[in-house]
Amino acid sequence: MKSQNSKEQKSDFSYKETLNLLKTDFSMRANSVLREPEIQNFWANNDIDFQLGSSNSGEIFTLHDGPPYANGALHMGHALNKVLKDIINKYKTLKGFRVHFVPGWDCHGLPIELKVLQNLKSDERKNLDTLNLRKKATDYAHIQINNQKEGFKRWGIWGDWNNPYLTLKKSYESAQIGVFGKMFLNGYIYRGLKPVHWSPSSRTALAEAELEYPDDHYSKSIYVSLKITKIPEEIQLNFIQKNINIKKDFFQNNSFITIWTTTPWTIPANEAVAVNPKINYIFAIDEEKRIYLFAKDLCSEISKKFNKDFKVLLEVKGSKLENIEYQHPSKNKNCRIVIGGDYITTESGTGIVHTAPGHGIDDFNVGQKYDLPITCVVDEKGNLNEYSGQFKGSNVLKDANDLIIEYLKVNNLLLLQENYKHRYPYDWRTKKPTIFRATEQWFASVNGFRSSALKAIEDVEWMPETGKKRIYSMVVGRGDWCISRQRSWGVPIPVFYKKNGNEILLNKEIINHIQELFSEHGADIWWDWDVKNLLPENYAKESDLWKKGKDTMDVWFDSGSSWAAVCELRSELKYPADLYLEGSDQHRGWFQSSLLTSVAVNNKPPYKKVLTHGFALDENGRKMSKSLGNVVDPNIIINGGNNKKTDPAYGADVLRLWVSSVDYSVDVPIGSNILKQLSDVYRKVRNTARYLLGNIHDYDPKIDSFEIDQLPLLDQWMLGRLVEVTDQISNAYENYEFSKFFQILQSFCVVDLSNFYLDIAKDRLYVSSKSQFRRRSCQFVMSKVVENLAVLISPVLCHMAEDIWQNIPYSTKEKSVFQRGWPIFSQSWKNKILNEHISNLRNLRVEINKAIEGCRNKQIIGAALETEVNYLPEDKALKDSLTWLKEFGNQDVDLFRDWLIVSNFQVVSDLVDNSLATDNNALGKIQINKAQGQKCDRCWHYQKETFNGIQNTKLCKRCSNIINFEFI
């Protein structure tokens, strides 16, 4: 009856107003769409952004920006690239380096030129001269740059946005002419007739970096028989020695060289066929008494393909076949067998290669050796010209192949036609096939400085290391670099040609003069001014003899000159740059073009370190494309989509967190599920920071600061853990291992703080007297944690970090988190013995919590404070740790009971009966019992001794004293 009566008299009075509850303006919800731009304005108005790094007193750190193309909307590839760079720059700024990040844009080239033309009506296109085209291209590029720039800034990227480098700027074009000029004067640039990758769809030559190689291209491959007209006496003697009696007339009328090609349209350009001198070839006769020449190792495959049974008449080394003559397949002339190289194999075909020196690099090289004609049968549109004879007017990408195949068939020269799937070069812009076509072009002779370039590669640190092997093999095997383009929107090659003849005018005086003119007036004057005004004064009298060249430079030469136009010219930067950071495709692009120009001019690489990242894919590992509907838009990640339920606004920091979470050295996935997971992590970090800020609202570090040995053991451990985490995160940033930062941050916020230190701290913070040491010491530690947590996350979660800093409730010397500098702690804060003991005790805490949670799940108890724990130790190290805690711990903070958040804990030698739960494990025996005594209505601890409180409430002795001294 008494117990029931006491329940009926239970008071509804709450001691909430007597507790030290959270107070902070740092909201639980980030509201990033509004708050992040406010923070960015704060940075801009207070010179916190890139100006901060520029004003540092340390060593210059230069991360040179590879220029994105000034066309189109920003995508996830941009986000991955620019955020990685920004993380590094912000970290270096905090470390005291002088960081001046100059963003850049690649502005010339065909895509912009085509965009301009597409936006014009037909009549406007016809009447458009070069200068107007260039003006429209300039205007278009600036619009694209401004759009992209605003996007980058919204991502929190710091940079010299008011003075970026643009490849269309006068100063840049002038510096680029300087690079070209020095390479020319060093003997590395020449003009010559040579097969180059030619895009009929773009009507210009292409560099290797402008090509794509899809795996699913099908070519019309053909096997062709070429009638032998003359055979050397040595081979005739071989037949005689083998007792093969074949009359000369019969042999010449019935013997054929067998070739295979995947480009039938080049047949009219044939000038020879090539064999490998090391391969064994056979003359084989079929049942129709026709003799064929092909590689011995391919006999079985050819027999199947032709559906013929062959009898081998004679085996001959390739080196012995030279000068066998045959009748050209479409022209009235004889050609011959020549000796080729290792490019001729027996992997496919016949082992004998159709050779058209005007339409292939290997063919060209063999042609040079044998002084063969360099016949080009195709014009700039891809149409066959007069040199193709009867096929003139047909197009290589349309009907030429079919016409030539039909011709060969009618003339009994076609042995077999079949589709052949292989990798084939496509124009990366138009997505259409390219061809090899011999034209007069300007080249950079890589042979002249290849060994220096390879040595420079060895001097650079490549991350990952595989990047070094990749670019090394590319430079070892690359041919001369075709740097001329037949387009209007680019930097002109500053050469003059004799009106009558092939003589060129290009020397040091002219190069320097053009460079000065471009510096003052820009490259447009090349089309605007006449020759007389472009030439130096002492050439004025002969200006009528010369005409301006029409070629522009490859855009890779544009961007590849950025070390000279940016790093070398700007005093706040340095050359070589500390770091280049781009996608892995740039080993054949910007990394390589920059390396080649820098080595050719200055005999050194333009960078000290090169870091590469993969590509952004969807969650299923597929390439993003509009057709698949799997494109992830960074703008939608930040601002949300039309349907905020399916596409919520996550803000820039979640985008940045994604970049830090992935192993960017390989291709990385992104999608809605990943974003939700990242948002959860972001929220946990934010809520951890909010809890820290909310509990130091009445803390003043000027009054309540402590030496570490004055603190309870738990607080000493927390500060030591802060030092360890800082060291780990520092190493992650230093080594560009940002995914480690992500993992360390998660573990620190969730495992060390939320689940352990802050969980235990609740009683100290809420229930203690405001100025009690157990509370102030905890606030001291929390202030250290929140200040340094803000700094540690600031390179990645820059907006949240600044938001935390602005909500620190006491005054700080620094206006911004980025002015604080990178944390430096005394290593004495780390205590190995303390760490070992607390690690043991945390392990025990985990096991006890499991047992308590089991009781809670069975609804035996509600809160853990309703229990008390008996522990029978079996682990010596753990027993020692409990003894250590009891001996050296602070009695107001370091009782293991309080670390468990139970009402009582005791080490026992025997367990009692009638427990709520018992658990036996390697650590010992754990027994969960119902807490004895009465519940304090203020702190909820169960105590055997309680006192009457307000309105029939019960208080423990501690809470009773606090209420009496502070509130009554």
Swiss-Prot record:
Per the Swiss-Prot or TrEMBL annotation, the motif 'KMSKS' region is positioned at 623-627
| InterPro entries assigned | aa-tRNA-synth_I_CS, aa-tRNA-synth_Ia, Anticodon_Ile_BEm, Ile-tRNA-ligase, Ile-tRNA-ligase_type1, Ile-tRNA_ligase, M/V/L/I-tRNA-synth_anticd-bd, Rossmann-like_a/b/a_fold
Q: Which UniProt keywords apply?
A: Aminoacyl-tRNA synthetase, ATP-binding, Cytoplasm, Ligase, Metal-binding, Nucleotide-binding, Protein biosynthesis, Zinc
The record's listing under Gene3D superfamilies reads: 1.10.730.20, HUPs (3.40.50.620), Ile-tRNA synthetase CP2 domain-like (1.10.10.830), Valyl/Leucyl/Isoleucyl-tRNA synthetase, editing domain (3.90.740.10)
Q: What is its EC number?
A: 6.1.1.5
In which family does this protein belong, per the annotation?
A: Belongs to the class-I aminoacyl-tRNA synthetase family. IleS type 1 subfamily.
Q: What is this protein called?
A: Isoleucine--tRNA ligase
GO terms (BP aspect)? isoleucyl-tRNA aminoacylation
Organism lineage: Bacteria, Bacillati, Cyanobacteriota, Cyanophyceae, Synechococcales
Main location class: cytoplasm
Please list the residues that bind L-isoleucyl-5'-AMP. E582
As its record notes, the protein acts as a catalyst of: tRNA(Ile) + L-isoleucine + ATP = L-isoleucyl-tRNA(Ile) + AMP + diphosphate
Q: Which organism is it from?
A: Prochlorococcus marinus (strain MIT 9301)
Record comment regarding domains: IleRS has two distinct active sites: one for aminoacylation and one for editing. The misactivated valine is translocated from the active site to the editing site, which sterically excludes the correctly activated isoleucine. The single editing site contains two valyl binding pockets, one specific for each substrate (Val-AMP or Val-tRNA(Ile)).
The Gene Ontology terms for molecular function here are: aminoacyl-tRNA deacylase activity; ATP binding; isoleucine-tRNA ligase activity; tRNA binding; zinc ion binding
- Record-listed Zn(2+) binding positions: C936, C939, C956, C959
Where does this protein hold ATP?
A: K626
Where, subcellularly, is it found?
Cytoplasm
Subunit details for this protein? Monomer.
Keyword field contains Phosphoprotein: no
Q: Does the keyword Membrane apply?
A: no
Give the cofactors, semicolon-separated.
Answer: Zn(2+)
Query: Gene encoding it?
Result: ileS
**CDD domains named among the record's database cross-references:** Anticodon_Ia_Ile_BEm (cd07960), IleRS_core (cd00818)
- What is this protein's function? Catalyzes the attachment of isoleucine to tRNA(Ile). As IleRS can inadvertently accommodate and process structurally similar amino acids such as valine, to avoid such errors it has two additional distinct tRNA(Ile)-dependent editing activities. One activity is designated as 'pretransfer' editing and involves the hydrolysis of activated Val-AMP. The other activity is designated 'posttransfer' editing and involves deacylation of mischarged Val-tRNA(Ile).
Q: List, alphabetically, the GO terms of the cellular component aspect.
A: cytoplasm
Q: What does the note accompanying the cofactor annotation read?
A: Binds 1 zinc ion per subunit.
